[in-house]
């Protein structure tokens, strides 16, 4: 049963959305009865609404056209500036990207508008892996908005040059057969190498929103035996056509031999697909390299019915770990916890333990402005955020590192209020364990008032590296340079104007990417990006992906990947691209 506070919040948001007539598509979750019913106090327990997840609008072009045709008032509509001066045309605000940072996207494509302007297709939400048998073979992935496909990007020179591969057979547009012939890409791409480096697994979501409200969704896996250059057709791991549940946020890992594990969140939406009853973390496994899969098993326990954002990994001793964000039964599900599920019998059973408080309450963040999803965001930003964990297990020592970002200590966070008051100051937290049973106390590894979000972690050869976005380097906008400021659409004139609120008009909103490592006990922040870039560039600033990636190779060197908003200066105008930093 959904707690009363959840239901009350659902009703209020649904009523407000109906009054505004919001139908923004792709990243606005245009299933108001379904998605908004899940938009309760615990914002981790919301279907992600990522790539392609929409009834009506599946592409950035459709999103832009809907926004321009149905603008909100100037103080509410945050408009994508990939087609607005000074972000339009071929002139870039940014200098070329240089080593040790490289653009993983090759031959990006653009889509045009009736007025002659255009935008380049975005890529966001990345995962990255290093071949354990060949540190030069680096592979990453992202939500790919070129032609409704699943895609990976592989390198054979340590991340300096890249090849882009569209995976065959996942969707109707990529030659899908059988069930896949009427499905679309729903994002959440994840990669995992087998311990010997011989097999590379890719997992992702597929769905069909044409059947709303009984939305169809599935999770599938494909395999590469040549480091990502070519791929098998996908195998469906879990799919039902009832629409009574929605699969979301899957994660894949590989164990010794041909063992593969896949976890995800299963949102139970009721017999008509319009509610939100619970969201357990579940798992399926394969013992033949992903050809066949077991039945679905529970990972989270009955005490934790509302969960999201799982990551699964195998320790050197064969123990299986699943980290996720779950609501805390001790507080009536009013607060959140980092939960770690441990299995020593190959996933037959799990022991779930609450490891750390996660400060992700209803009163810990402002909400997105109307026109987006009503999700948590940062002060003066518009992209949705979360506190899902990122986990890595060192294959040489068995040490486990888990990171996340939350807003502890900011404003009235944790006061029990229904709304946030103050200024966000998100920070990255770290917990570690040598045995999977005993855990360190949460440690805040970042400092300063500027927000840090979407942390990811990699561990190998005794070294831990953590990457994250930071607002610490963003210049403030000026009268002559708005590149790191907010622009809004005047619904009367159609012009882009400054916010009327002085605080928003002067807000510095650009992001950078930074890393810290255990080499100096995480004391030093290394700025990876050479220029700050503006996240409002695509999707009206409402979506930059729900996770990032960091990995450490056997040589102790790290690669890290994030959504950057510069595009590829000199080749494309500003847009969302997957950039990879190497050699850290």
Predicted segments — roles?
Residues 15-28:
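Bacterial N-terminal signal peptides
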Residues 38-584:
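C-terminal PAP-associated
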Residues 1-12:
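N-terminal secretory signal peptides that target proteins for export/translocation
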């Amino acid at each position: 049963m959904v707690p009363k506070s959840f239901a009350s919040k659902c009703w209020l948001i649904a009523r407000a959305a109906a009054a505004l007539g919001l139908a923004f598509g792709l990243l606005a979750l245009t299933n108001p009865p379904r998605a908004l019913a899940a938009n309760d106090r615990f914002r981790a327990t919301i279907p992600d609404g990522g790539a392609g997840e929409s009834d009506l609008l599946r592409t950035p072009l459709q999103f832009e056209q809907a926004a321009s045709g149905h603008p909100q008032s100037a103080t509410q509509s945050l408009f994508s500036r990939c087609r607005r001066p000074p972000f339009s045309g071929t002139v870039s605000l940014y200098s070329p990207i240089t080593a040790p940072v490289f653009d993983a996207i090759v031959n990006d494509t653009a889509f045009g508008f009736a007025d002659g302007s255009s935008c380049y297709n975005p890529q966001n939400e990345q995962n990255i892996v290093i071949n354990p048998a060949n540190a030069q073979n680096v592979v990453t992935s992202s939500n790919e908005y070129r032609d409704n496909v699943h895609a990976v990007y592989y390198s054979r020179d340590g991340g300096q040059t890249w090849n882009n591969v569209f995976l065959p057979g996942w969707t109707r547009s990529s030659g899908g057969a059988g069930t896949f012939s009427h499905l679309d890409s729903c994002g959440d791409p994840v990669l995992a190498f087998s311990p010997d480096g011989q097999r590379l697994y890719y997992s992702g979501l597929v769905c069909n929103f044409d059947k709303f409200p009984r939305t169809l969704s599935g999770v599938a896996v494909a395999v590469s035996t040549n480091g990502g250059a070519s791929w098998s057709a996908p195998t469906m791991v879990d799919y039902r056509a009832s629409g009574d549940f929605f699969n979301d946020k899957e994660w894949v890992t590989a164990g010794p031999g041909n063992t593969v594990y896949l976890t995800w969140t299963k949102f139970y939406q009721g017999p008509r697909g319009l509610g939100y009853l619970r969201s357990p973390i579940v798992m399926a496994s394969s013992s033949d390299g992903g050809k066949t899969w077991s039945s679905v098993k529970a990972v989270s326990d009955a005490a934790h019915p509302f969960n999201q954002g799982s990551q699964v990994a195998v320790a050197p001793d064969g123990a299986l770990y699943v980290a996720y964000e779950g609501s805390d039964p001790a507080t009536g599900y009013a607060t959140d916890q980092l939960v770690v599920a441990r299995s020593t019998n190959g996933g037959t059973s799990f022991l779930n333990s609450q490891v750390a408080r996660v400060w992700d309450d209803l009163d810990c963040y402002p909400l997105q402005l109307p026109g987006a999803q009503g999700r948590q965001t940062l002060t003066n930003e518009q992209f949705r955020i979360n506190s899902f964990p990122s986990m890595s297990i060192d294959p040489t020592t068995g040490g486990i590192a888990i990171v996340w970002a939350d807003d502890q200590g900011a404003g009235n966070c944790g006061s029990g209020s229904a709304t946030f008051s103050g200024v966000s100051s998100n920070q990255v937290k770290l917990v570690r364990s040598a045995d999977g049973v005993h855990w360190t106390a949460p440690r805040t590894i970042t400092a300063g008032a500027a927000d840090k979000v979407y942390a990811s972690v990699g561990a190998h050869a005794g070294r831990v590296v953590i990457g994250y976005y930071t607002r610490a380097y963003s210049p403030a906008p000026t009268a002559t340079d708005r590149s790191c400021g907010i622009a809004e659409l005047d619904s009367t004139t159609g012009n882009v104007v400054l916010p009327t609120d002085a605080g928003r008009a002067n807000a510095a909103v650009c992001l950078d990417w930074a890393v810290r490592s255990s080499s100096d006990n995480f004391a030093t922040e290394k700025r990876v990006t050479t220029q700050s870039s503006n996240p409002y560039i695509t999707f009206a600033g409402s979506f930059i992906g729900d996770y990032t990636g960091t990995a450490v190779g056997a040589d102790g060197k790290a690669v890290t990947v994030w959504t950057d908003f510069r595009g590829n200066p000199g080749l494309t105008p500003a847009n969302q691209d997957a950039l990879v930093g190497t050699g850290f």
